[in-house]
Amino acid sequence: MRRHIIGTLFLCNKPASTFSPLSKFTSEELRLLSSFTHQIAIAIENHQLNNSIHSIFIDYIKSISAALDARDAYTHGHSKRVATYSVGIGRELGLTPGELEFIELSSTIHDIGKIGISSDILNKPGRLSDEEFKIIQSHPHKGSKILEPMSRLSVLMPGVRNHHERYDGKGYPDGLMGDDIHLIARIISIADTYDAMTSDRVYRKGLSKEIACQEIEKCAGTQFDPNLTTMFLTYINQYRENEIIKADHKPDTAILLQA
């Protein structure tokens, strides 16, 4: 039995009948109305439950991102910046609020596979050897394996597994080409590369915004989707360094919570 009120149903006067100007609701009508309000209550509670599940889902994604940042000291904040840039590209494309949130969440955990990489390699204060670089290149595959058993996170798989694919088919791990690469992965690829170029590392200073944009533009049609490259350059030229992801897109639970 419910012990709390979640809403009220207000009934106006019942239309008068031929024989009575002040008709009353019959017991049968009241029974039907009671059944109707019960169904409404169930629908409302289910909606509230979906919202609660969605909030837990979002918090889980943020926790994963925080864990990644804690392991890789030199790329602290990388996931959030990539998410910001990726959502910016999505807005330039005119994507829906639900699609924007999908992009935000996918890009937030795009490097989840690095959890399976040794901290000694992630935090090495210098350039990586060829063997170490191969190990780093395994993180998209490791990330997809981490997500595989978690059905609610499987919708984020393309951004995790394929953000290092190239438009010309020379990327990894699957060697996908052109539009065979999922849209979210093509978006994250640009955002991820831009942030990597403009971020400082122990062994080098980050590139300026202008030089990084020139490099991105040079790689349009080879490494990156040319149309998305144009969208990115339009967005980044308006980008403010203190910009954060604004919560102006609402959850699309049909996309995010599918089993």
PLM segments and residue spans:
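Metal-dependent catalytic cores of enzymes that make or break cyclic nucleotides
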Residues: S17-S27, N51, S55-A259
